[in-house]
Amino acid sequence: DKDAKTLTVTDRGIGMTADEVERYINQIAFSSAEEFMEKYKNQAIIGHFGLGFYSAFMVADKVEIFTRSYKEGAKTVHWSCEGSPEYEMEETTEQRDRGTTIVLHLSADTLEYGEDSKVEELLRKYCRFLPVPIAFGKVKEWKDGKYVDTNKDNIINNIAPLWTVKPTEITAEQYKDCLLYTSPSPRDGL
């Protein structure tokens, strides 16, 4: 939301309970994170222990999490932090679908991350081959002399890249599509 100066990421996954937020989000930040990072600095720990989550504070002054677990009777959990060891967390009666929403309140010097073009560029660069569909906006179609959004999600990644398929099962059209999708100058190889 460019006007609100926020970047919001939502999934429809299994969500988290308050105990899980405490364990997975607060565990590193409030249990000697510097010591932990020093100890494991030479190991590939990105994607573990919630460390990637804390990189959000590189672009945000404040981060909020709204999450609701798939577990029966689960309540929505709201977690909020402004980058210090202090945070707020509460269970609310707000009805939300199962899953997690993370809201980054962008800092003044990182507002470019509120621009659709910048977000799409980063998603295509870093999420291009993730095994789950990543939707960003809606597919646009030409109607009455202008592009308009449809109800169809704009999936920006390829969840089944060619290297996951047996070569004997790949068609010439699939090779061509892969080249167009991955090459900076796709016409060179056609």
Q: Model-predicted segments: where are they?
A:
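GHKL (Bergerat-fold) ATPase N-terminal catalytic module, capturing the glycine-rich phosphate-binding loop
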Residues: 1-108, 112-114, 121, 128
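Short, exposed beta-strand "edge-strand" segments with a Pro/Gly-rich flavor and a Y/T-containing core
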Residues: 10-16, 30, 161-170, 189
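Secondary-structure boundary/capping residues
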Residues: 34, 132-135, 189
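Flexible, glycine-rich phosphate/dinucleotide-binding loops
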Residues: 72, 143, 189
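ATP-binding catalytic core of ATPases
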Residues: 86-145, 149-180
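Single conserved hydrophobic/aromatic residue that forms the stacking wall/gate
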Residues: 181-190
